[in-house]
C-alpha cells in the first residue's frame, strides 16, 4: 500500500516517505547510512542481523527496532545514532564475530565500530548467519534447497 506520503522526524529533521516504506528505505533515500548484513534489495525484509537497529519514540517509551522491517509511521521520531543504538550494534557485531571470526565483512564492521574484543567463545563457522543465501534460494530461485539448522 504505497503512495501516500508520511511525515516523521529522523535524527531531528522533518522528513517524508511513502506509506509502506521501512525506516531503512527512508534513511537510504535521505542518504543516511545504517549498517546491515541481512538486508538485500529485492528480498523480503528479515531483520535477522539486527545491525540496522534504530531508536524510535521519546523518553521512557523509546525502543530499539530493526529499521529494515519497521514501517514508517506518521509523526514518529527515529534516531539512528544514539548511544543505545551504537551499543546494540556493537553487541551484535561482537556476537557475530564470535560465530565467524574469520569473516572479512565482520572484521571490517568490528573495525568500523571499534569492537576490539569479543567476550564470547569463538565458534569458527564459515556462515555469518545473515540469512541472505537462504532467502535468495527460496525467494528468487524458488528452490528452498538450503536453510538454517
Residue ranges and their predicted role:
Residues 1-2, 42, 133-134:
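Intrinsically disordered, low-complexity segments enriched in polar/charged residues with Gly/Pro
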Residues 2-13:
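Eukaryote-biased recognition of intrinsically disordered, low-complexity regulatory segments
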Residues 5-6, 31, 115-116:
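Generic signal for short, ordered secondary-structure residues
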Residues 12-74, 87-88:
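N-terminal cofactor/phosphate-binding cores enriched in small/glycine residues
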Residues 50, 54-149:
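Fe-S ferredoxin-like electron-transfer domains
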